[in-house]
């Protein structure tokens, strides 16, 4: 079904079954598969493939060379009807690739709203991305990665499968992210080492100075205490019940995960 207001270049192939919303623009030499849904106001520039069971949210813009909704690159991919769901108002730049999920792990790759994917970044199967995230050029997310709201990943960084990146974390360019990164954490290097808190991001998010000072104190107690990271976090929880950002970090640490936690020491040399 193609809305009457959609504008589609005659050189593009729209397969039967695709759903094309109002005011969608599709430029030259694009391929839209039979199980694709493009919501209203989506814009696809040129030489883009949107395939698989893929839905693209309202107002999202996709630049040349992107391949959206390709099969999982997992060796265990069952080739069944898994899906990719992309939210509203995302910008997907040149050469970006996003894969559908795998049946074995829920069958869906989920991307939220207002995200920016710069050139040649990659979102693998079964990833879960929140809102207002930036993946800079050549960022690589392996399968099953979770990236929470407002995280920023610097150019060329690579994230190990099943890793979690907390809300408003900042990953430096060319970093290797092998372990979970706490909310508001900053990670740099290869191997990646936690290097403090994203204070600039916290300030931009409207967190006031007294709260930032408390979160800094919480951070030191977690990573410089005598016990393990998780034991230290559990021991201080009651002290921060009235500080939402600190509790967010403590809850993140307490949650079950397939990966260990990044720290100022794990991965550091010397």
Swiss-Prot record:
It is found in: Cytoplasm. PANTHER family: ACYL-[ACYL-CARRIER-PROTEIN]--UDP-N-ACETYLGLUCOSAMINE O-ACYLTRANSFERASE, ACYL-[ACYL-CARRIER-PROTEIN]--UDP-N-ACETYLGLUCOSAMINE O-ACYLTRANSFERASE, MITOCHONDRIAL-RELATED. SUPFAM superfamilies: Trimeric LpxA-like enzymes. The keyword Lipid biosynthesis applies. Involved in the biosynthesis of lipid A, a phosphorylated glycolipid that anchors the lipopolysaccharide to the outer membrane of the cell. GO terms for biological process: lipid A biosynthetic process. The keyword Lipid metabolism applies. This is Acyl-[acyl-carrier-protein]--UDP-N-acetylglucosamine O-acyltransferase. Belongs to the transferase hexapeptide repeat family. LpxA subfamily. It holds the Pfam family Acetyltransf_11. GO terms for cellular component: cytoplasm; membrane. Its EC number is 2.3.1.129. Keywords: Acyltransferase, Cytoplasm, Lipid A biosynthesis, Lipid biosynthesis, Lipid metabolism, Repeat, Transferase. GO terms for molecular function: acyl-[acyl-carrier-protein]-UDP-N-acetylglucosamine O-acyltransferase activity. Pathway: Glycolipid biosynthesis; lipid IV(A) biosynthesis; lipid IV(A) from (3R)-3-hydroxytetradecanoyl-[acyl-carrier-protein] and UDP-N-acetyl-alpha-D-glucosamine: step 1/6. Homotrimer. It comes from the Bacteria. It catalyses: a (3R)-hydroxyacyl-[ACP] + UDP-N-acetyl-alpha-D-glucosamine = a UDP-3-O-[(3R)-3-hydroxyacyl]-N-acetyl-alpha-D-glucosamine + holo-[ACP].
